Amino acid sequence: MSPALFLCQRCKEPLKLLQQQGGPLEVQHHANTPTEIPVSAESQVRTSGRPHSDGGRVSQGSALCTFTLLTSGGPDSEGGTTSQGNACCTFTLLGESASMRTMNTIQNTVLETFEILSDQKVVDHPLCVDCTDHLLMQLDDQLALLASDNQKYKSFQDRELLVSEEEREALHAELCAELSSLEQEEARLTQELEDLDGHHARVAAELRAAQAESKELYKQHEQHRVEYSVFKMEQLELMDQLSSVENQLTYALSQQYRLRQTNIFNATFTISDEGPLGVINNFRLGCLPGVRVGWTEISSAWGQTVLLLFSLSKIAGLQFQRYQLVPFGDHSYLKSLTGDGVLPLFSDGSHSVFLNNKFDCGMKAFLDCLQQFVEEIERDERCPCLPYRIHVKEGLMEDVWDSGECCSIRTHLNTEEEWSRALKFMLSDLKLILAWASLRFSRVQRP
């Protein structure tokens, strides 16, 4: 048969049960000696129809285990059995192994269960030795506390017996007055507490309102921060654009200042008369037997010369008589104002040097326009004195500063040296006129 298993109701440790010869199962204890619990006559009648041979004890065949409650009572003198007044209790095993389930054990189990459920039997819970010691310590502490309270009550009672009736009444009146004062203080404190509760409620409401306002302000702050970031980005972009515009303005002002300091005629037209041939904008005007120049370059040089005189007349406000200058690159020409004739200032070399050709007429007409411009600028006192005089009818350029030599500008019955020298004299006069016009008209136009 397998022994029954019980657990301590406090620490849940298993309790070891010992089965003795001729007696019930007992629990091992260290503090007190366990006693056998007899079954009453009523129980004996319920459990079995015949008396037991051991003088009223439960036989070993019954499947009931007895436990002794640890109290101050000792074992009874009659055969080691415990009297009915002892605080012992029988514990019933509900559900044992199949080998112990006989009709007798089943009947006893049912009866014990009925007594437990009908409150006819007090059920105590088994404890191990350590838990029992702990329980006893707690009970000792409670007993000491109760003894202290009992001593205080006894001392108070003894003191009350020594007090006279008058002193008791005076003390009662004093205590009543103190009680009344304390009741008033309690009422005042109660009112103050109610006021504080009301104030607390108002403060709580204000706090909730402040928290709601704080949340709203935080949302607004976040929204404003996002808007600030957007505006800050736009500001940075605008600052970049402004910086770019300022840089462009600074560059434009510097360019404007440089352009104002730059003379347009000097920057556009460059005339050189130091060599054997006159040169304008790197185009040679004329040719020599030892220096052959193509007619395309000569025509381009004439185009630059026409453009120079045309520009000077425009800025001076001069309207030419008899001819109109038409700058057209290497195919520039003069248009007659009295007729429909056109006098070219370009040639491909096919014109006859023995006849009065249009190319020669065009060069004479150009000298006529140049003479008109010279007469216009001579009205200014600061006009330079030109080194070469123009004879329009003859088509001659006279050197008045040096030898007084006259050179014809025509190719008809003329040599290349004399023709080239006449062209060089003409460019020399234009160079001086260009320098005068650069100073004269630049001061007028500059703010």
From Swiss-Prot:
Gene3D superfamilies: 6.10.250.3110, Autophagy protein 6/Beclin 1
Chain positions covered by the region annotation Required for homodimer formation: 186-256
GO cellular component: cytoplasm
Domain of life where this protein originates: Eukaryota
Reported tissue expression: Expressed in brain, skeletal muscle, placenta, thymus and uterus. Expressed at a lower level in liver, testis, stomach, and 17-day-old embryos.
Location, primary (coarse class): cytoplasm
Keyword Membrane listed: no
Keywords linked to the UniProt accession: Autophagy, Coiled coil, Cytoplasm
A Pfam family this chain is assigned to: APG6
A single BP term in Gene Ontology: endosome to lysosome transport
Inactivation phenotype: Decreased embryonic viability: embryonic and postnatal survival rates of homozygous mutant mice are markedly lower. Heterozygous knockout mice show defects in autophagy, increased levels of Cnr1 receptor, elevated food intake, and obesity and insulin resistance.
Subcellular location: Cytoplasm
Molecular function GO labels: protein-containing complex binding
Coiled coil, from the record: 169-228
Family, as annotated: Belongs to the beclin family.
Its job: Involved in 2 distinct lysosomal degradation pathways: acts as a regulator of autophagy and as a regulator of G-protein coupled receptors turnover. Regulates degradation in lysosomes of a variety of G-protein coupled receptors via its interaction with GPRASP1/GASP1.
Subunit text: Homodimer (via coiled-coil domain). Interacts (via coiled-coil domain) with ATG14 (via coiled-coil domain); this interaction is tighter than BECN2 self-association. Interacts with AMBRA1, UVRAG and PIK3C3/VPS34; these interactions are not disrupted by starvation. Does not interact with RUBCN. Interacts (via N-terminus) with GPRASP1/GASP1; the interaction is direct.
Protein name from the UniProt record: Beclin-2
Organism of derivation: Mus musculus (Mouse)
